[in-house]
Amino acid sequence: PYETLWNTTATWLEREEALYNGSFTEIDGELIEDEIDRFGKDINNAHKQFTRLGMDACVSIAEQIKEGVTKFKPLVPLVQGLRNKGIRERHVEQLSEQIGQSIVLDDKFTLQTAMKMGLTEYAEEIAKIGETAGKEYQIEIALTEMEEQWKDIDLELLSYKSTGTHVLKGYDELTQVLDEQITMTQAMQF
């Protein structure tokens, strides 16, 4: 239990500083929830073990770390929304309009900055915009992949015997790719 407590404490204190005061662009919006949940689970386990052993000093340390993790948890949707891979300038502008403040997500922007701006009050709106941006991003990726598929398809127009007409070679592959992409496009939901 000592190793868990000290490793979790050391890692959390470093990570907490980076999360609040480090560049927001360094935070991975996709991993943040799992990371915070892992910290919470580890420190809860250590807290339970030291409570059972009656080691008050270690319990106190675990409680301090637990408090820090608990305090951070409500910020996760805000971080996920603003650090979504799909966030584009138009989304930031939309958010800026909604809250009546200019937001600039550059290297100088930190979670502390977001908190000072009062963005925690808009966490739900930010999460929705982030979710929309994420869906748009998935569609962008799918469209790029579809375009790439077409680059590999060659169509040839061949003379058909001596009739003066032509036939299309590669038609079967073309229709197969087209059918797959139509199905994929219909499955995309926004």
Located regions from the model:
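Extended alpha-helical scaffold segments
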Residues: P1-F190
